[in-house]
């Protein structure tokens, strides 16, 4: 059974190598969207089906970090699949450990091999770069992003050319994503996918397969 990591703000900041903290006067801008938990459930079931190496799957989801946890929609689902979930956020949404700026952390939680989050869209590039700085070779970073995140010359040069995109897990149907966690009852007009990043394998050398990202479809 999954356990939520407990600790005070100081212990969390120390654990993640972060010296700066959030202050009550800070408030989030409008870049706050939450995903419907049923869509997270579909994704986690999809991963469980597609990771053929059961031992690696268990290692990957032993300790999971959600660094932009918001109100906990992702964390609460992942807790059913992981041994431990550490939930942090810069802002106080009433869930997890607040005042933790992911971009200022210098180390992972102990035994963490997986970061999974729905990052602020305006900071998507920075989240990817920082996650790749923190993660060891066999670890993974999963980010929920607009499918259009694949496009753009600048992004190609800054992200895809230098990082290792392992897979794209696409929702073939529209999922519910709520601004400021306000359920309007309508599905999002945006198409979403989970982008899976990881470092190049140690024996990776083929120039002919420079960007071997796989495409998966998430079925209900």
Question: Can you describe what each PLM-predicted range is?
Answer:
Residues 1-220:
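Class I S-adenosyl-L-methionine-dependent methyltransferase catalytic core
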């Amino acid at each position: 059974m999954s356990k939520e990591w407990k600790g005070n703000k100081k212990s969390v900041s120390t654990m993640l190598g972060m010296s700066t903290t959030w202050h009550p006067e800070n408030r989030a801008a409008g870049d706050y969207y939450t995903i419907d938990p049923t869509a997270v459930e579909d994704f986690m079931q999809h991963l469980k089906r597609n990771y053929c190496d059961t031992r690696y799957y268990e290692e990957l989801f032993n300790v999971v970090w959600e660094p932009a946890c918001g109100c906990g929609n992702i964390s609460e689902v992942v807790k059913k699949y992981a041994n431990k979930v550490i939930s942090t956020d810069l802002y106080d949404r009433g869930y997890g450990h607040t005042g933790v700026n992911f971009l200022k952390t210098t180390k992972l939680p102990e035994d963490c091999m997986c970061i999974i989050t729905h990052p602020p869209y305006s900071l998507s590039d920075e989240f990817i770069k920082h996650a790749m700085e923190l993660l060891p070779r066999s670890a993974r970073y999963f980010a929920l992003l607009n499918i259009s995140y694949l496009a753009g010359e600048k992004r190609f040069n800054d992200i895809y050319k230098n990082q290792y995109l392992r897979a794209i897990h696409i929702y073939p149907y529209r999922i519910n994503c709520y601004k400021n966690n306000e359920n309007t009852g309508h599905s999002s007009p945006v198409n979403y996918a989970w982008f899976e990043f990881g470092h190049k394998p140690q024996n990776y050398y083929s120039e002919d397969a420079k960007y071997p990202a796989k495409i998966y479809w998430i079925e209900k």
